[in-house]
């Protein structure tokens, strides 16, 4: 007589967590940090078309790592929810905390009820409405629905430990935008360094955007081209600076399966 396969609940949760963490670690790093006028997002992203950073609503931005099709589905769902709430009530009734809670609930439900968890990690950033003097806020949402507000910066994806250590050493509160970009780029470069003195890989293309509190309505702005080059450190010379020009994907890679 054969017995059905049995795994304890604890083992199932451990297996799901390990699967999600491995998927997230394969993605390239994203840094979100606060600066004097809002929130800065800097992502290592060699792709022109697959964006890891996005506007969600007037004063709210979104960044993610992991499986593109999974976090893009969450991003679009958040945009639709925010549009409906802003239309039904008032645009000021849409907040980053509400969106972060919705993402956390969705990821928690998927993690607990579906066979495969989403291999994603999210960051929701928010700046105060124009004319208000409130500090920017960053929320981290993990694959299992855990949510935490971070006071200064968030690091997700890839080799996070050296990126975090670099920010601990260099980050200064209320820095100017150029300085903040320098902190983020230096941290991302630390994440690409080889272990034990071995040669690391070059930092790929950058996707850069900000939430600017000084903008009257829509705070989100992408930084590209000459504007981005003027903000980059003098010793930074990647092949791309706008998240473009990636070589053709390896066989089997697609928009639906690619890790970002």
From Swiss-Prot:
BP terms from Gene Ontology: modification-dependent protein catabolic process; proteasomal protein catabolic process
Compartments where located: Cytoplasm
Keywords, alphabetical: Cytoplasm, Proteasome
Signal peptide: none
SUBUNIT field: The 20S proteasome core is composed of 14 alpha and 14 beta subunits that assemble into four stacked heptameric rings, resulting in a barrel-shaped structure. The two inner rings, each composed of seven catalytic beta subunits, are sandwiched by two outer rings, each composed of seven alpha subunits. The catalytic chamber with the active sites is on the inside of the barrel. Has a gated structure, the ends of the cylinder being occluded by the N-termini of the alpha-subunits. Is capped by the proteasome-associated ATPase, ARC.
Molecular-function GO terms, alphabetical: threonine-type endopeptidase activity
HAMAP family per the UniProt record, alphabetical: Proteasome_A_B
Record has Cell inner membrane as a keyword: no
Species, as recorded: Mycobacteroides abscessus (strain ATCC 19977 / DSM 44196 / CCUG 20993 / CIP 104536 / JCM 13569 / NCTC 13031 / TMC 1543 / L948)
UniProt pathway annotation: Protein degradation; proteasomal Pup-dependent pathway
GO terms under cellular component: cytoplasm; proteasome core complex, alpha-subunit complex
Classification of source organism: Bacteria, Bacillati, Actinomycetota, Actinomycetes, Mycobacteriales
Name by which UniProt lists this protein: Proteasome subunit alpha
């Amino acid at each position: 007589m054969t017995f059905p396969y049995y795994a304890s609940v604890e083992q199932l949760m451990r297996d799901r967590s390990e699967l999600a963490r491995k998927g997230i670690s394969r993605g390239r790093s994203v840094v979100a940090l606060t600066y004097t006028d809002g929130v800065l997002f800097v992502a290592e992203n060699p792709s022109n078309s697959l964006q890891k950073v996005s506007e969600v609503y007037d004063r709210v931005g979104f960044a993610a790592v992991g499986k593109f099709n999974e976090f893009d589905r969450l991003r679009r769902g958040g945009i639709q929810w925010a549009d409906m709430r802003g239309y039904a009530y008032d645009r000021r009734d849409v907040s980053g905390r509400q969106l972060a809670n919705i993402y956390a609930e969705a990821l928690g439900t998927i993690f607990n009820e579906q066979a495969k968890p989403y291999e994603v990690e999210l960051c929701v950033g928010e700046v105060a409405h124009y004319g208000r003097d409130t500090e920017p806020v960053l929320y981290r949402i993990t694959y299992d629905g855990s949510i935490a507000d971070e006071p200064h910066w968030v690091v997700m994806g890839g080799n996070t430990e050296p990126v975090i250590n670099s920010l601990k050493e260099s980050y200064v509160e209320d820095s100017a935008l150029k300085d903040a970009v320098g902190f983020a780029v230096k941290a991302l470069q630390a994440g690409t360094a080889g272990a034990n003195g071995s040669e690391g890989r070059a930092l790929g293309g950058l996707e850069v955007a900000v939430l600017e509190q000084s903008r009257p309505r829509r705070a989100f702005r992408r930084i590209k081209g000459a504007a981005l080059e003027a903000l980059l450190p003098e010793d930074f010379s990647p092949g791309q600076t706008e998240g473009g020009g990636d070589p053709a994907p390896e066989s089997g890679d697609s928009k639906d399966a690619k890790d970002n």
